[in-house]
A protein has these predicted regions:
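C-terminal-biased regions
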Residues: 124-134, 140-147, 158-187
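Arg/Lys-rich, alpha-helical DNA-contact motif
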Residues: 11-16
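Conserved amphipathic alpha-helical segments that form helical-bundle/coiled-coil interaction surfaces
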Residues: 24-119, 141-144, 156-170
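Single conserved hydrophobic/aromatic residue that forms the stacking wall/gate
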Residues: 1-10
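A short glycine-threonine-serine/GTX helix/turn-capping micro-motif
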Residues: 19-25, 132
């Protein structure tokens, strides 16, 4: 048990740098992209309702966190809700192996999510911008992913996912001017 705990700490440290986060980002993009495509094709009403419930929970906890961005418990809560939303997409594939793999790397994914949320909200604060709902200020939103699944739009899902994951810089989250060269943005 002790060695497992040390292994978890080691893994988090191994991936807690720019290159490591990129590895996690690519794994998430691979799994979440494939599962989103499957969800678009074969999700049930029950699947979609579960995803909507996770979306509503995320939106509520995001709003609570945005009112107190230095509160570590509120950050933890929104990270867990964010993970639950993305895991629900994995579950919509009905592929047990995808679900197991995602859960095996849950701590790494949660660390990636935490980094993105924390960095982006503090970047917005430093720029003097509203800390309101990200869904209201950018197309890189969980709502956009949800709607793309409902509407069967794989391209919209890919665009939103790549911005949420930090693969493509998101206006309103990663940059605030008309254009910033993506090479100048460091997530």
């Amino acid at each position: 048990r002790v060695s497992r705990g040390l292994g978890d700490v080691y893994k988090r440290q191994l991936y807690d740098n720019k290159e490591g986060r990129r590895d996690v980002e690519q794994l998430r993009n691979l799994l979440e992209g494939e599962c989103t495509n499957i969800a678009i094709i074969s999700s049930t009403e029950e699947d979609r309702q579960k995803l909507k419930d996770r979306l509503d929970e995320y939106n509520l906890l995001e709003a609570i966190y945005n009112d107190d961005i230095e509160n570590q418990q509120k950050l933890h809560d929104v990270v867990q809700a964010d993970f639950a939303f993305h895991y629900e997409i994995i579950c919509m594939s009905h592929n047990k192996l995808y679900m197991d793999i995602y859960m095996m790397v849950q701590q790494l994914i949660s660390s990636h999510i935490r980094h993105l949320i924390y960095t982006r909200v503090h970047r917005r604060k430093a720029a003097g911008l509203s800390l309101g709902s990200m869904d209201a200020i950018t197309e890189a939103s969980h709502e956009a992913i949800y709607q793309s699944i409902i509407n069967g739009d794989a391209e919209a899902a890919r665009n939103a996912r790549e911005q949420i994951l930090g693969i493509v810089p998101a206006h309103g989250l990663d940059y605030f001017e008309d254009y910033v060269d993506p090479k100048d943005i460091h997530l």
